[in-house]
């Protein structure tokens, strides 16, 4: 009987410890998120370029002038992520005419979905494992609360 109680107390303490650990880690993640958000929102944006890119974006979230299929050292699909980043910045940064336009958010999500679905390859491990994911995350972070 005493062993059962000790076991229950031990398990309760372990569970409590894990919960507080998870809460602390979540706080750390929020600190990192806020720092990244602050850094990205301090970047300059080209609103007129974002408007031009939006105007020629295809209904599937792609751009006609980008080659998503050819595997080359120069990764043409990189321009897709750079455009999405600029558009996401225009959407997220207060004080410009594209700030929080609902149709803009839909197009950003469409562009992210297209890139994820097509999954273009450069043939270069660095871009596949580091470059593209680090660029892909920027619109995701900027729209975190809305996705």
Please place each PLM-identified region on the residue numbering.
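Boundary/junction segments of secreted and surface-exposed precursor proteins
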Residues: 25-29
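Boundary at the C-terminal end of the N-terminal hydrophobic targeting segment
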Residues: 19-24
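N-terminal secretory signal peptides that target proteins for export/translocation
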Residues: 1-3
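Sec-dependent N-terminal signal peptides
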Residues: 6-15
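Aromatic-lined, polymer-binding surfaces characteristic
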Residues: 51-147
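Contiguous, function-dense segments enriched for cysteine-driven chemistry
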Residues: 41
């Amino acid at each position: 009987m005493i062993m059962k109680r000790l076991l229950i107390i031990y398990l309760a303490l372990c569970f409590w410890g894990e919960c507080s650990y998870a809460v602390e880690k979540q706080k750390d993640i929020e600190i990192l998120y806020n720092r990244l958000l602050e850094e990205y929102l301090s970047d300059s944006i080209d609103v007129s370029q974002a408007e031009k890119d939006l105007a020629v974006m295809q209904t599937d979230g792609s751009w006609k002038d980008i080659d998503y299929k050819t595997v080359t050292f120069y990764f043409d699909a990189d321009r897709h992520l750079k455009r999405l980043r600029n558009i996401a910045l225009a959407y997220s940064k207060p004080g410009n005419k594209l700030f929080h336009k609902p149709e803009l958010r839909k197009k950003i999500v469409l562009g992210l979905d297209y890139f994820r679905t097509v999954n273009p390859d450069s043939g270069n491990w660095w871009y596949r494992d580091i470059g593209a994911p680090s660029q892909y995350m920027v619109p995701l972070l900027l729209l975190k609360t809305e996705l």
